[in-house]
Amino acid sequence: KPPFGALLAMLINGVSLFLCPVPMPVLGVVAIAAAIAWVVLFGREGVADTNCALVISPLGLVGFAPLAPMIAGYCLPPRRALGAAIIQVVLMLTVGKNTGPELLFGSITSIPTWIMICGWIIATVLMSVLCVRETRILSILGAICAALILLIAQGIGLTILTGFPAGPSGTWAITTVLACVAMCVVGVLGSSVRHKGE
């Protein structure tokens, strides 16, 4: 089943990190714990949870990582969207060098990284909350709010990193806006690919 296949993949990822001194074994332990907790709490809910959690890897590979939290927020109820967002973050921190999103986070010990993580999770949950009623207007509003949070989070992170006021990078801004537009179109079309029942 997809959830157990996802668990196996994430466990292998965690073990490989634990056995590798770089970046750090503790990250492997975190990855293993997060994978087990996610499957126990959320992953068994259905295929949608698995897809929303793991979609970050292919999207990051093609440069559209900002679409991942919006997809999770659109398709899942808040509690399950939170679980998917956490797994997305863990995957970005652990396999980012293979999928691209490491440029969004950088070092796990830096403040900008944690600002981005918080923004990512808040954007996902807020979009999910707004999309619960499954109306076109709230779906569009959810996508816009999620995009703004992602843009602001990176802007704040870059400001702290550089020491002077800065906005999000051009690439991040473009991909986030495109992701927002895509989700607005999905919202207008009223796609039924949702699993909002808790």
Model-inferred region functions:
Residues 1-23, 32-37:
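Core alpha-helical transmembrane segments of integral membrane proteins
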Residues 2, 78-79, 114:
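Membrane-interfacial loop-to-helix junctions in multi-pass transporters
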Residues 3, 95-102:
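Transmembrane helix-loop junctions in multi-pass membrane proteins
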Residues 3-8, 48, 138-143:
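Membrane-interfacial loop-to-transmembrane alpha-helix junctions, especially the N-terminal start
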Residues 20-32, 109-118:
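Structural signature of hydrophobic alpha-helical transmembrane segments
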Residues 28-98, 119-135, 146-152:
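Short helix-perturbing small/polar motifs within transmembrane alpha-helices
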Residues 100-198:
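C-terminal transmembrane helix-loop-helix hairpin of multi-pass membrane proteins
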